[in-house]
């Protein structure tokens, strides 16, 4: 409106134009004085954009929700998801999105089955109450590797993992034993959930869990949603390995996976954890 008045001042007086547009002359002159200077909203957006760009430069895989959580956690900025989304749009940046993978039915091989005691109740009230595990695969320098992971459902922390070029029972037993030895002081019984893979139903693995008084739970055949949290995590993890850590350039795949696991445990905000990374959420709770 003030800009329209400015355009017509060569033919009409300011008094006439302000009367026509229904604004005060003092308002017009204040606008004229600060013309070309950003208002307080524009200044705020500029500061926000700088913060968003800084976070994006360090964590290019983060979407607007995670950047919003990090703004709140690290810089004390209380902003909405749409505000951060608009900031990213202004800057022409975006996080990485993951393509959904079609569900694959399970094997029909006969093997030992355990009941689905977890029953898609993915919320845990305390650490080491509910653990989920799964195996995924990664091709590196023309060779297939297998990665077994164990996640604590209390805070989505990867508490153990094992990388091997052999798809055998030791792939899941080694990290399980390390985890259970560390957590021998846990007073409550642990529920450990997996799919019906032959490694998880092997005598050695089942006996190991019994030795530590762990309750074993398994997904139903052909129901990947019974272990949805872990299945979903592997998708995000491998996308991050590819798009941020560029694992194919590394000569040490294990070291790269360790870096990515550190990122997910110590740096990546999780919305259900009040925007905090898993380890920070756990340590603040027990402190």
Model-derived features: positions:
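C-terminal domain-tail junction helix/linker
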Residues: 203-206, 210-214, 235-287
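Basic, flexible linker segments flanking DNA-binding modules
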Residues: 18, 25-126, 223, 277-285
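Short, amphipathic alpha-helical "recognition" segments used to contact nucleic acids or chromatin
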Residues: 1-12, 49, 53-58
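RNase H-like polynucleotidyl transferase catalytic core
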Residues: 97-103, 192-196, 210-229, 245-250
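An active-site-proximal beta-strand-loop segment
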Residues: 120-159, 165
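Residue-level signal for the short linker/turn that defines the boundary of a DNA-recognition helix
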Residues: 12-13, 62, 79, 248
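Active-site beta-loop-alpha junctions of metal-dependent nucleic acid enzymes
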Residues: 162-185
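Mobile genetic element proteins and their domesticated derivatives, centered on retroelements
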Residues: 18, 28, 52, 67, ...
């Amino acid at each position: 409106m003030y800009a329209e008045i400015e355009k017509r001042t060569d033919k009409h007086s300011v008094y006439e134009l302000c009367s026509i547009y229904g604004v005060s002359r003092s308002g017009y002159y204040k606008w004229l004085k600060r013309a070309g200077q950003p208002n307080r909203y524009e200044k705020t957006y500029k500061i926000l954009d700088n913060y968003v760009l800084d976070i994006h430069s360090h964590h290019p895989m983060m979407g607007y929700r995670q950047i919003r959580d990090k703004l709140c956690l690290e810089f004390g900025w209380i902003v909405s998801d749409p505000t951060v989304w608009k900031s990213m749009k202004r800057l022409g940046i975006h996080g990485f999105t993951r393509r959904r993978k079609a569900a694959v039915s399970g094997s029909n091989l006969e093997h030992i089955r355990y009941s689905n005691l977890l029953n898609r109740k993915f919320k845990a009230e305390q650490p080491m109450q509910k653990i989920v595990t799964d195996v995924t695969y990664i091709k590196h320098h023309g060779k297939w590797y297998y990665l077994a992971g164990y996640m604590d459902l209390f805070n989505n922390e990867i508490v153990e993992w094992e990388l091997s070029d052999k798809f055998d029972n030791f792939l899941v037993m080694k990290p399980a034993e390390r985890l259970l030895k560390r957590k021998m002081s846990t007073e409550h019984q642990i529920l450990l959930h997996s799919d019906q893979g032959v490694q998880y139903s092997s005598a050695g693995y089942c006996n190991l869990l019994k030795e530590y008084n762990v309750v074993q739970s398994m997904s139903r055949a052909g129901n990947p949603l019974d272990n949805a949290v872990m299945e979903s995590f592997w998708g995000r993890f491998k996308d991050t390995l590819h798009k941020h850590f560029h694992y194919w350039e590394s000569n040490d795949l294990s070291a790269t996976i360790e870096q990515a696991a550190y990122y997910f445990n110590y740096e990546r905000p999780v919305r259900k954890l009040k925007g905090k990374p898993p380890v920070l959420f756990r340590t603040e709770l027990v402190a």
